Amino acid sequence: MPELPEVETVRRGLEPALVGARFTTVHLARPDLRFPLPARFAARLTGQRVEALSRRAKYLVADLSSGDALIMHLGMSGRFDVVFPDGRQLSPGEFYLEGAPGQAKHDHVVFALSNGARVTYNDVRRFGFMDLVRRAELETCRHFAGMGIEPLGSDLSGEAVARLFRGRRTPLKAALLDQRLIAGLGNIYVCEALHRARLHPEAAAGTLADAAGRPTRAAARLAQVIRDVLTEAVAAGGSTLRDYAHTDGTQGAFQHRFRVYDREGLACTARGCRGRVRRIVQAGRSTFYCETCQPAP
């Protein structure tokens, strides 16, 4: 499943095609994706101008001139294909490499735009979804209600980490993946951030706050490396794995910078470290960490 950097890569690729243009027609190949599409979905979109395209956690949000917001989630294999009037083609979000995701039979929603562009949503596994909500109700809608802070930007700090994790006995990795605390973090980038912060994934999350609730040095370090890892991943166009390639058909490159993720048994890449990467399973997901850099609690 695409994580925050991959979704941000998609947003940046779609923005030039969508923002400022109106939907002239919306073709639905089926009435549902992962969930049924909203009632009168095509009719509510047709004629509306896209005023902005943003990202919240792993969701894309298009602000429309009608006051609605179009929420889009890529699921496991969703992607967008853009064709411009001059014939140029762009696939911002072509991270899916398994099989032939570009087959027309998997084209589920086609947006024709007033600037002459055509944007097609293609989804092999059909785990993605789209919804329409009033923009004024965006933060309280079922998708975003109770969602945590954004890890990119000023909201994430050592103080925020201490406040969110104080008193929690849950493993640190599980706390970082809890979307009610910090929204948008996924397995890959949590493993990478914990390694850079030299924190064991099974350490209690509450240890990042002292007895008075103040952030420890580890909390400040973790907040910084989370931002660093995500920023580097966005700049690299995300990570291409078995399921996932990148804007205009090229592949994301951050997987070549993995320090621990999917490197079980290999030597740690940290300078001066002679440890090896280990893999454990937490809540059904693989966790990768260095046995030396990230000592057990």
Curated annotation (Swiss-Prot):
Binds 1 zinc ion per subunit. It catalyses: Hydrolysis of DNA containing ring-opened 7-methylguanine residues, releasing 2,6-diamino-4-hydroxy-5-(N-methyl)formamidopyrimidine; 2'-deoxyribonucleotide-(2'-deoxyribose 5'-phosphate)-2'-deoxyribonucleotide-DNA = a 3'-end 2'-deoxyribonucleotide-(2,3-dehydro-2,3-deoxyribose 5'-phosphate)-DNA + a 5'-end 5'-phospho-2'-deoxyribonucleoside-DNA + H(+). The active site is at P2, E3, K58, R285. Coiled coil: none annotated. Gene3D superfamilies: 1.10.8.50, MutM-like, N-terminal. Its EC number is 3.2.2.23, 4.2.99.18. One of its GO terms (molecular function) is damaged DNA binding. GO terms for biological process: base-excision repair. DNA binds at H106, R125, R168. InterPro entries: DNA_glyclase/AP_lyase_DNA-bd, Formamido-pyr_DNA_Glyclase, FPG_cat, MutM-like_N-ter, Ribosomal_uS13-like_H2TH, Znf_DNA_glyclase/AP_lyase, Znf_FPG/IleRS. The keyword Hydrolase applies. A zinc finger (FPG-type) spans 259-295. The keyword DNA repair applies. Monomer. Involved in base excision repair of DNA damaged by oxidation or by mutagenic agents. Acts as a DNA glycosylase that recognizes and removes damaged bases. Has a preference for oxidized purines, such as 7,8-dihydro-8-oxoguanine (8-oxoG). Has AP (apurinic/apyrimidinic) lyase activity and introduces nicks in the DNA strand. Cleaves the DNA backbone by beta-delta elimination to generate a single-strand break at the site of the removed base with both 3'- and 5'-phosphates. Belongs to the FPG family. This is Formamidopyrimidine-DNA glycosylase. It comes from Methylobacterium sp. (strain 4-46). The lineage of its organism: Bacteria, Pseudomonadati, Pseudomonadota, Alphaproteobacteria, Hyphomicrobiales. The gene is mutM.
